[in-house]
């Protein structure tokens, strides 16, 4: 019996390690996607190289840093793991020196942004679940991870955050994170559930862009 218990324990540890690495990969891919958006914003505002790199890093990591601080994952992964900083800097340099090529790819950039949104939403919700947060808090952490960096980026360049004006931005992140959290109740630590959550978020965001779906805005008197 002890032998069988040991095997079960090892299997559980291996599964947790796989899930942890899966979430880290999602976080890193999302980091690069959002770093590109931050760098593009910097170049558009004619900011120097240092500023572009700062915006690249902020857009890619601010949401994750806020999430980690709130759930007690200290120090935050973005400053503890060299890969986050490296990916952010690479994305910033690529955008700064080859912006003319990236500027021609409006649709691909929107796709990368939507992909980053979905990856961060499910990675944020998944990490919150791993830290034993409740369902509501886990959904909020997924949304914060997905939209936090973009909000800080826009504030730094004196713009209204795109999350308040774009086509179903936060709503898409909310939907993806909710799928992960609800799915985890029935299928704990399930990679397919995370994949479905990502597809829901990315799909909803791209459909909103295509069809110009937006939340209603209050009407002001003339």
Residue ranges and their predicted role:
Residues 54-58, 65-71, 140, 144, ...:
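Short, structured motif recognition centered on aromatic/hydrophobic residues
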Residues 50-58, 81-85, 106-117, 141, ...:
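Cytoplasmic-side transmembrane-helix entry/capping segments in multi-pass membrane proteins
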Residues 35-45, 68, 93-106, 151-161, ...:
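C-terminal ends of transmembrane helices
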Residues 1-22:
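Short, strongly hydrophobic alpha-helical membrane anchors
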Residues 56-64, 88, 113-126, 168-181, ...:
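Small-residue-rich segments of transmembrane alpha-helices in multi-pass membrane proteins
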Residues 71-79, 103-109, 128-138, 155-166, ...:
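A cytosolic-side transmembrane-helix exit/cap motif
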Residues 19-31, 76-90, 134-146:
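Structural signature of hydrophobic alpha-helical transmembrane segments
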Residues 24-37, 55-58, 176:
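The first (N-terminal) embedded transmembrane alpha-helix
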